[in-house]
UniProtKB/Swiss-Prot annotation:
InterPro entries: Exonuclease_RNaseT/DNA_pol3, RNase_T, RNaseH-like_sf, RNaseH_sf. Mg(2+) 2 binds at residues 23, 25, 181, 186. This is Ribonuclease T. One of its GO terms (cellular component) is cytosol. Its cofactor is Mg(2+). PANTHER family: DNA POLYMERASE III SUBUNIT EPSILON (PTHR30231), RIBONUCLEASE T (PTHR30231:SF2). Disulfide bonds: none annotated. It comes from Shigella flexneri serotype 5b (strain 8401). The gene is rnt. Trims short 3' overhangs of a variety of RNA species, leaving a one or two nucleotide 3' overhang. Responsible for the end-turnover of tRNA: specifically removes the terminal AMP residue from uncharged tRNA (tRNA-C-C-A). Also appears to be involved in tRNA biosynthesis.
Length: 215
């Protein structure tokens, strides 16, 4: 492992993983059959002192894939009209291709080896993104096929809250419930929450590891 003084890089902090915050809005709960309707991604960076912060934001409204299910209950919940021409929706391929292109550049620039998804209740977002990547025959998917950083679990440990809005408020962050269930807003809040948890652990002395505990 590097000397403590050198542990200010993303690649050192997360064992070579490049964290990317993701949130999706969908037309149901089944990643194989229900439409992906919106996706946002935020890459992260560290400053020279090793503090984590948001970096680049990408956001796309997505066209339902051919034959996709559109559950009325899900659409009522997130307020998305898939047929609204003003959404400016793009294909799954276009959205994921652009996200992955930026992510691959970030991996290279940071000296990391692979991207890892950060999301709130991450299994849901991960399953939809991976299913969409498979449908789009996306080449060179930079994301780990199953590992994630789940901010619901991390916030439960660090803050005693698992609901995104309550975790943000407990951490001293603003949360506007009227903007919730927008992929862009939820990704922004999740990114700031993840950074706060990581940085709080650093402020408390948990990172870098004390001498003798490095591996």
């Amino acid at each position: 492992m590097s000397d403590n003084a050198q542990l200010t890089g993303l690649c050192d902090r997360f064992r070579g993983f490049y964290p990317v915050v993701i949130d999706v809005e969908t037309a149901g709960f089944n990643a194989k059959t229900d439409a992906l309707l919106e996706i946002a991604a935020i890459t992260l960076k560290m400053d020279e002192q090793g503090w984590l912060m948001p970096d680049t934001t990408l956001h796309f409204h997505v066209e339902p894939f051919v034959g996709a299910n559109l559950q009325p209950e899900a659409l009522a919940f997130n307020g998305i009209d898939p047929n609204d021409p003003d959404r400016g929706a793009v294909s799954e391929y276009e959205a994921l291709h652009e996200i992955c292109k930026v992510v691959r550049k970030g991996i290279k620039a940071s000296g990391c080896n692979r991207a890892i998804m950060v999301a709130h209740n991450a299994n849901f977002d991960h399953s939809f993104m991976m299913a969409a990547a498979e449908r789009a025959s996306l080449k060179r998917n930079p994301f780990h096929p199953f590992a994630t950083f789940d901010t619901a679990a991390l916030a439960g440990l660090a803050l005693g809250q698992t609901v995104l809005s309550k975790a943000c408020q407990t951490a001293g962050m603003d949360f506007d419930s009227t903007q919730a269930h927008s992929a862009l807003y939820d990704t922004e809040r999740t990114a700031v929450l993840f950074c706060e948890i990581v940085n709080r652990w650093k402020r408390l002395g948990g990172w870098p590891l004390p001498a003798g505990e490095e591996v």
